[in-house]
Every structure is written in structure tokens, then in C-alpha cells.
Amino acid sequence: MPSHKSFMIKKKLGKKMRQNRPIPNWIRLRTDNKIRYNAKRRHWRRTKLGF
């Protein structure tokens, strides 16, 4: 990836970076909670973003 990114690409990368984190622990502690982990985690080497 070039070091000079367009602003739109940079914005998309930032969004994907924020999405790619584990769920907070307090969400796991809520009543009737069925979410155990973030099912949409993405590993930088296994799955590419495609842009």
C-alpha cells in the first residue's frame, strides 16, 4: 500500500480498524447476553479488505 493514501481510503481504513476489536467486557456481563465474542474480527494476513 502506498504511503500517500487518498482521504476516502484513509477513512475506510480507519473505520475497519475501529471495527476490528474485541467486544467490551461489560457487554458480556449483561443479562441474557448471548454474544461471547466479535464474530466479525478480521486478521490482517488471513482476510484482506478488498480495496
Curated annotation (Swiss-Prot):
- SUPFAM superfamilies noted in UniProt: Ribosomal protein L39e
A single BP term in Gene Ontology: translation
* This protein's record includes keyword Flavoprotein: no
Kindly indicate where the leader peptide sits in this chain: none
Could you tell me which residues belong to the region Disordered?
1-21
Keywords, A to Z, come to:
Ribonucleoprotein, Ribosomal protein
An annotated GO cellular component of this protein is: cytosol
Gene Ontology molecular function, alphabetical? structural constituent of ribosome
The record's section on PROSITE patterns has: RIBOSOMAL_L39E
UniProt keyword Ion transport present: no
Alphabetized Gene3D superfamilies for the sequence: Ribosomal protein L39e
Q: Where is the composition biased (Basic residues)?
A: 7-19
Xref: HAMAP family? Ribosomal_eL39
Please state which protein family the record places this protein in: Belongs to the eukaryotic ribosomal protein eL39 family.
Q: What's the protein called, per UniProt?
A: Large ribosomal subunit protein eL39y
Q: Which organism is it from?
A: Arabidopsis thaliana
Gene behind the chain: RPL39B
